[in-house]
Amino acid sequence: MRNFARYSAVKDLSMKQTFLYAVCGVILVTAFSGCAGINSLLKSGQPELIYSKALEYYQKEKWSRASTLFEGVQHYYIGTPREDSVSFFNARCKFKNRDYDTASALFDDFRRKFGRSAFIEDAEGMYALCFYYLSPGPSRDQTMTGQALIAINEFMSRYPHSDRVENFKQINGELTQRLHDKSYLNAYTYYKIGRYKSAIVSLKNALKQFPDSNHREEIMYMIVDASYRFANNSIANKQTDRYLSMLDSYLSFKEEFPESKYTKEVDRMAKHARDYLDRNKKDEDKDNNI
């Protein structure tokens, strides 16, 4: 009985493997057939046939195959009324395949060559979206975010009534916030590792660049704290000026956030700074009276 069960299990496994091999074989044959068909088309020298098949793949959303054919037929249509169509469809295939680097280059080329094309609005919209999709999180370099913002704002200025505008407004807010976060993270890094002078400069720049940042309260608190620590760690003849600067930051913070969760901490720092300044003034008065 055990031998029979073992035989049945082995037989079932063998049948499953055979089925999988058959499926894989069909997939490979189909793929090779598709490639062979595309290569034959490209070698046929019949641009109308190639273009027609490219459109067929395009409509079926087989982006890679469509792109291969559009690229292969493109040179036949240079200088003809169909040139912009081939260029646009090929760029959109790259976009749909999430090859945003290539798509952005193709759309950029398209918008420079075919400014009067019926596809120009869509091309410029997808050109902007390429940079949006290439834009990384705030912890990484934000060059693409900057390019996305430029392209998106140019699009909204050029096509104020486009269906894309509402979506682009949301994206604009999202990307701007990403730059806020990047600026904040850069400043916070200096603060966290104890480079308080650099932190103060970076934090103040962050506020200057993005006055409406949702990190504003925390940034202003860190300016007070970094200024306090910077003054506290300074040599004696630098401390007075640095504590005075810290108190300026403290007063700005208190004026803007009188009910802040950081109130007790900044009040404690301010008291210490004032106590130091009072003691220092008394010492100076004594020296002057001698």
Which ranges hold each PLM region?
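Sec-dependent N-terminal signal peptides
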Residues: 17-26
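Acidic, polar-rich low-complexity tracts and alpha-helical solenoid repeat scaffolds
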Residues: 4-9, 19, 31-290
